[in-house]
From Swiss-Prot:
Protein name: tRNA dimethylallyltransferase
Site (Interaction with substrate tRNA): residue numbering on this chain: 107, 129
Species name: Azoarcus sp. (strain BH72)
Chain's role: Catalyzes the transfer of a dimethylallyl group onto the adenine at position 37 in tRNAs that read codons beginning with uridine, leading to the formation of N6-(dimethylallyl)adenosine (i(6)A).
Region: Interaction with substrate tRNA, residue numbers: 41-44, 165-169, 247-252
Matches recorded under PANTHER family: TRNA DIMETHYLALLYLTRANSFERASE
Keyword annotations from UniProtKB, A to Z: ATP-binding, Magnesium, Nucleotide-binding, Transferase, tRNA processing
Complex formation: Monomer.
Similarity remark: Belongs to the IPP transferase family.
Keyword Plastid belongs to the record: no
Amino acid sequence: MSSPESALPPALLLLGPTASGKTASALALAATLPVEIISVDSALVYRDMDIGTAKPSAAEQAVCPHHLIDVVSPEEAYSAARFCAEASVLMRDISARGRIPLLAGGTMLYFKALRDGLSDLPPADPVLRRAIEERAAAAGWPALHAELARLDPDAAARLEPTDAQRIQRALEIVTLSGAPLAASYARREDAPLPCRLLPIALAPSDRAVLHARIEQRFDQMLAAGLVDEVAALRERYVLQPQMASMRCVGYRQAWEFLDGEIDRATLRFKGIAATRQLAKRQLTWQRQFRDQWPELVELDCLAPDLPQHVRDTALRLLGA
């Protein structure tokens, strides 16, 4: 007997670490299948952030419809909850048009939230966030980490005293909910998905080769004007270095360079190191997915004919 999920229209998922060839593989799928691409990338949502995010070019975006790119200002926050809500609507609409949603990107939290549902967490509170930031500016994030340790020892134990983003969110949740993080995460909101998910993951057979790709791509970003892009963003928008957009890899380091905190050689070194750390975290997520998601198919992102492998795998998953 078929499951209710098997009656749903299909949605392809293409996930992988930075510099793994996701864009080229997604466009190869678009040349074969009637797909519309839904970006699963917490950096591509920001307008005017093109170089450091490796945003698909106008020509690449013209190959097929792209969604969830350039949807918010760099001054705004964009959450996993908003992604899930917007991606679900898009998946339903794309399927209704007789086309196939292709969710491609490297923000693994978004993939997990889409698959497993979201915890019932309170939404961001701008006033409370500003108050926390002001206290951090006066006392330092380690002091706020100590405060979190008094309110929620388990949450604080999982965070470094300098992890500003997560300390801020943890304090926000504990303050708004009046309960430890674990209690909030235990409450889940599971909305049924409009599609059955067919996941393809890209992973390197040789981590050193991926690291070399990352180094080359970061050098290309610098040559293309990453620093000038960040300078223009600072002129155009009211930004702070702790904002989510400016915490993106490359942007954080360019901000430090523009503030005179580091020289260009250090910018390059720190940018490459941060990108490698990002790739490591992404691959850690993927290993968890591989263990928990039996239908996931993993391909070597270093294979010379990767786009063909992705096409063949997608066709097999679709039963075409």
